Regions:
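Extracytoplasmic/lumenal domain signature
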Residues: 1-31, 36-167
Length: 167
């Protein structure tokens, strides 16, 4: 756990005195997907994870120490990096949702995909999510689903119902 005091669970959404509701729930910045091990351009192994806070992390796989952290999204209980990152050739790819419906965080939403250098945490490029919703109900730009990478492509299913391929 990298966010002290974050014990949010679904009971936090139930009105009244719900069982299992923590007294101080925290911001709901859990890790929605398993971490992945990747090698950086420096030859070192890194344990990588994406958090709903919108922050990507690299940990030392032996000690668990945080080596770097890079913000790529606003984050929130409906935002940040949701359900899967990917890595190849020294790069981490982080899909970000950042729903515009975020009562707890007034910062601007930053949905899209970011490529991050595994060894340094430096953002190499970012591609904002296309907003093709045109007012359709329940349609929001961004990426919640896990993405896939090949040596040349990033494959991503978007929350707006489109499948996108980035090269």
């Amino acid at each position: 756990q990298v966010t002290p005091g974050d014990s949010w669970n679904v009971a936090c959404t139930v009105p009244g005195d719900a069982p299992n509701r923590p007294e101080d729930a925290g911001p709901d910045y859990d890790f929605g997907a398993a971490p992945i091990m990747a090698q950086g351009s420096d030859g070192r192994s890194y344990l990588l994870a994406g958090q709903k806070s919108g922050v990507a992390y690299a940990f030392d796989p032996d000690s668990g120490a945080i080596l770097w952290q890079t913000r790529v999204g606003r984050g929130g209980w409906l935002g940040g990096i949701h359900f899967g990152i990917a890595a190849d050739s020294g790069r981490l790819y982080a899909p970000v949702f950042d729903s515009p419906i975020e009562p707890d965080n007034p910062a601007p939403a930053r949905p899209g995909i970011s490529a991050i250098d595994v060894a340094s945490g430096e953002v190499l490029w970012q591609t904002p999510a296309a907003n093709v919703c045109n007012g359709r109900p329940l349609c929001e730009p961004g990426y919640s689903a896990a993405i896939t990478v090949t040596p040349e492509l990033v494959l991503a299913g978007a929350n707006d119902g489109h499948f996108r391929i980035l090269s």
